[in-house]
């Protein structure tokens, strides 16, 4: 039974992603459809159109297995050996700096939201 529940939750998450892709394509937006889908999911959660319990296990599963989604990308990088040889150090620096920036912004926003949530309770 758990397998069916998990599959349904993942399907619901993908429905938001697909809807976002469709909106981005139809409206010719410069924003990736996946971002629009995440925004739609956020709004749906905020206004209780979708309950957290409906997606929690599916989201947890996808996060646990996230590394599997990066394997094809990592393998594809091998095709650009010349570029890596020429710009490898620059690329590593860019990746490290951008990862640091994303981590810092995420941490700051999380702290801000938690403080804000704490002050309203």
From Swiss-Prot:
Which terms under GO biological process does the entry name?
cytolysis; killing of cells of another organism; programmed cell death
Listed GO cellular component terms?
plasma membrane
Member of which family? Belongs to the CidA/LrgA family. CidA subfamily.
Q: Which membrane topology describes this protein?
A: Multi-pass membrane protein
User: Which protein, by its recorded name, is this?
Assistant: Holin-like protein CidA 1
**Which Pfam family is one of those matched by this entry?**
LrgA
Record flagged with keyword Transmembrane helix = yes
**Gene symbol of the encoding locus:** cidA1
What keyword terms does UniProt attach to this protein? Cell membrane, Cytolysis, Membrane, Transmembrane, Transmembrane helix
Q: Where are the transmembrane segments?
A: 7-24, 28-50, 62-81, 91-113
- What's this protein's function? Increases the activity of extracellular murein hydrolases possibly by mediating their export via hole formation. Inhibited by the antiholin-like proteins LrgAB. In an unstressed cell, the LrgAB products probably inhibit the function of the CidA protein. When a cell is stressed by the addition of antibiotics or by other factors in the environment, CidA possibly oligomerizes within the bacterial cell membrane, creating lesions that disrupt the proton motive force, which in turn results in loss of cell viability.
Q: What coarse category fits the chief subcellular location reported for this protein?
A: membrane
Which organism does this record belong to? Bacillus cereus (strain ATCC 14579 / DSM 31 / CCUG 7414 / JCM 2152 / NBRC 15305 / NCIMB 9373 / NCTC 2599 / NRRL B-3711)
Localization (cell): Cell membrane
């Amino acid at each position: 039974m758990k397998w069916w529940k998990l599959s349904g939750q993942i399907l619901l998450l993908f429905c938001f992603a697909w809807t976002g892709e469709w909106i981005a394509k139809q409206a010719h937006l410069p924003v990736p459809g996946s971002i629009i889908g995440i925004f739609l999911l956020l709004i749906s959660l905020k206004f209780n159109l979708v309950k957290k319990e409906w997606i929690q296990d599916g989201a947890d599963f996808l996060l646990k297995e996230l590394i599997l989604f990066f394997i094809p990308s990592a393998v594809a990088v091998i095709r650009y050996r010349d570029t890596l040889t020429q710009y490898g150090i620059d690329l590593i620096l860019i990746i490290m700096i951008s990862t640091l920036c994303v981590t810092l912004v995420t941490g700051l926003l999380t702290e801000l939201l938690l403080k804000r949530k704490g002050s309203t309770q």
